[in-house]
Amino acid sequence: MNKTITALAILMASFAANASVLPETPVPFKSGTGVIDNDTVYIGLGSAGTAWYKLDTQAKDKRWTALAAFPGGPRDQATSAFIDGNLYVFGGIGKNSEGLTQVFNDVHKYNPKTNSWVKLMSHAPMGMAGHVTFVHNGKAYVTGGVNQNIFNGYFEDLNEAGKDSTAIDKINAYYFDKKAEDYFFNKFLLSFDPSTQQWSYAGESPWYGTAGAAVVNKGDKTWLINGEAKPGLRTDAVFELDFTGNNLKWNKLAPVASPDGVAGGFAGMSNDSLIFAGGAGFKGSRENYQNGKNYAHEGLKKSYSADIHLWHNGKWDKSGELSQGRAYGVSLLWNNSLLIIGGEAAGGKAVTDSVLISVKDNKVTVQN
């Protein structure tokens, strides 16, 4: 293991002398969303506010170009998908017309040809924040995420409390001091058909819903990795959705980032190797929860993982490290590798760089 990581450090040092993977993002970028269509990358929202940008990865002079602003206001934790020439944005957390923080269940569509947005007359049957989105056979699929009513109620209470610190402490204690199942994270799988703009029930997890999981899909299989089991408590679980045949099958794989797990990690594929990297969590929270402390992360400091794990022979192996721990950026499949754009580093600082993780013969290469 030490030899592997030492070799990785040498590779990282050699890449440092070369050109960066992508130009720095126009603003420090975290908690946003992004997609790739052929060779064009689109990113937006999160710490970028309502801004969206695109970049042609094959251009000689690579640069981010500003697009039309998102009309739905600033959003964190929205997701996106590119289907049949259009970019779709699903939900997110933002402020409503009254200035209250809330979870949205709406859908916006961006047309690259006209550089224009439209809000669709379509609403998911539940809120979408902390959820994941992936595309299969021309449809967008959504699963996971927080419970809209519980989350919105929490922020309504905080708004009413104003600057009353005593009231805020009581609200937080009430909100965090519950068991995981009492938060009703979404375990349903929903499908969105762009041609009809209709939502449909596509199945549900036999286990539990998560928020802030990493997602990657290839062919008929999709993997959901880690995420929150409740606010402040992560899981090390890995779920596999198999669309092969007529019946969707849910499988549970060996855990990763044990015992505490992380949220906001990055997942991808390279030469058929499943990759999981980064993420943030609270070390010791799982032990606290198992010992009966529901407010499991109380008093704990958020830590950021730099670990890179590969799925190999039915188990996860730590196979390398990022140059720094990071979470809550965008992960995309590009050039047969995992492309990470932006994210959040220690102290919650948003970053502007990109990272490319490639795998060959179970050996990891990291390019910054």
Swiss-Prot record:
EC class (word): isomerase
Keyword Signal tagged: yes
Gene3D superfamilies, per database record: Kelch-type beta propeller
Subcellular location as annotated: Periplasm
Kelch repeat intervals: 40-84, 86-137, 139-173, 174-219, 222-265, 287-336, 338-367
Active site residues of this protein: 228 (proton acceptor)
Broad class of the protein's primary localization: periplasm
InterPro entries (alphabetical): Kelch-typ_b-propeller, NANM, NanM_proteobact
GO CC terms: periplasmic space
Reaction catalysis annotation: N-acetyl-alpha-neuraminate = N-acetyl-beta-neuraminate
Coiled coil: none
SUPFAM superfamilies listed in its UniProt record: Kelch motif (SSF117281)
UniProt keyword annotations, A-Z: Carbohydrate metabolism, Isomerase, Kelch repeat, Periplasm, Repeat, Signal
Keyword Transferase: no
Extent of the signal sequence: 1-19
Molecular function in Gene Ontology: racemase and epimerase activity, acting on carbohydrates and derivatives
EC number: 5.1.3.24
Assembly and interaction partners: Homodimer.
Family, similarity comment: Belongs to the NanM family.
Functional description taken from the UniProt entry: Converts alpha-N-acetylneuranimic acid (Neu5Ac) to the beta-anomer, accelerating the equilibrium between the alpha- and beta-anomers. Probably facilitates sialidase-negative bacteria to compete successfully for limited amounts of extracellular Neu5Ac, which is likely taken up in the beta-anomer. In addition, the rapid removal of sialic acid from solution might be advantageous to the bacterium to damp down host responses.
Protein's UniProt name: N-acetylneuraminate epimerase 2
GN (gene name): nanM2
